Amino acid sequence: MAAARLCLSLLLLSTCVALLLQPLLGAQGAPLEPVYPGDNATPEQMAQYAADLRRYINMLTRPRYGKRHKEDTLAFSEWGSPHAAVPRELSPLDL
């Protein structure tokens, strides 16, 4: 019983530590917008802000491949075989 309680305590502790060590994210996993350093900022601070802002914009506008809804795409089995013969009507030249 003591071993089970110890394992449960370690699991709870490791879960709490893992949650606390996660990077700070905004709502629904979006990164936080960088804070403007002010009008009297040094050129180094402005360069760092510009780099952070560029990273922030790139993160928000990156393409998300493979994140489509199931209704928007057809299943491969619905396409049919690419080698299947397509029935066609006979033309007067075929007769």
Swiss-Prot record:
SMART domains: PAH
Domain of life: Eukaryota
Main location: secreted
Subcellular location: Secreted
Keywords per UniProt: Amidation, Cleavage on pair of basic residues, Hormone, Pharmaceutical, Secreted, Signal
Signal peptide feature range: 1-29
Gene Ontology CC: one annotated term: extracellular space
Gene Ontology annotations of biological process type: feeding behavior; neuropeptide signaling pathway; protein secretion
Signal in keyword set: yes
InterPro entries: Pancreatic_hormone-like, Pancreatic_hormone-like_CS
Inducing stimuli: Released in circulation upon food intake. Also up-regulated by exercise.
Propeptide boundaries: 89-95
Modified sites of kind Tyrosine amide: Y65
UniProt entry tagged with the keyword Signal: yes
GO molecular function, one term: G protein-coupled receptor binding
PANTHER family hit by this protein: NEUROPEPTIDE Y/PANCREATIC HORMONE/PEPTIDE YY, PANCREATIC POLYPEPTIDE PROHORMONE
Sequence similarity: Belongs to the NPY family.
Protein name per Swiss-Prot or TrEMBL: Pancreatic polypeptide prohormone
Species whose genome carries this gene: Homo sapiens
Phylogenetic placement of the source organism: Eukaryota, Metazoa, Chordata, Craniata, Vertebrata
